UniProtKB/Swiss-Prot annotation:
Keywords: Cytoplasm, Metal-binding, Nucleus, Ribosome biogenesis, Zinc, Zinc-finger. PROSITE patterns: ZINC_FINGER_C2H2_1, ZINC_FINGER_C2H2_2. This is Zinc finger protein bud20. The lineage of its organism: Eukaryota, Fungi, Dikarya, Ascomycota, Taphrinomycotina. It holds the Pfam family zf-C2H2_jaz. InterPro entries: C2H2-ZF_Maturation_Protein, Matrin/U1-like-C_Znf_C2H2, Znf_C2H2_jaz, Znf_C2H2_sf, Znf_C2H2_type. Involved in pre-60S ribosomal particles maturation by promoting the nuclear export of the 60S ribosome.
Length: 124
């Protein structure tokens, strides 16, 4: 008997994208909005489908935990501290995107304001 022939088809055509988006978390700009509206996370409704009945939630990481002890251990960990570091940066806005392609009105910088106000006449 001869050897088994190799497959001549695409092995996993796009499956990695399906697996990646199936359990996709929240983006940083969504978490920024959650941090500004943190009052709605003070009293969470009881949900039997979530870990810890949905009562122990880390807003910065958008994760539920089984107990308050698990939440405290998480907040001391590297993953949580790395997320806090990423959240210090302001999210990219639509105005910045439009200014990058010269569609919208960019914010006027200090240098351009000074250039507009300086009407200096040079003596000959």
């Amino acid at each position: 008997m001869g050897r088994v022939a190799r497959k001549r088809k695409h092995h996993s055509n796009g499956n990695h994208a399906l697996f990646r988006t199936r359990v996709y978390g929240r983006d940083l700009d969504q978490i920024h909005n959650d941090l500004t509206e943190s009052e709605k996370f003070d009293k969470l409704p009881i949900d039997p489908d979530l870990p810890g009945l949905g009562q122990h939630y880390c807003i910065e990481c958008a994760r539920y935990f089984d107990s308050s002890q698990a939440l405290l251990v998480h907040k001391k960990g590297k993953v949580h501290k790395r997320r806090l570091k990423n959240l210090r940066e302001e999210p990219y806005t639509q105005e910045e995107a439009e200014a990058a392609v010269n569609i919208g009105q960019p914010k006027q910088s200090v240098a351009s304001k000074l250039a507009d106000n300086s009407n200096v006449v040079m003596a000959d």
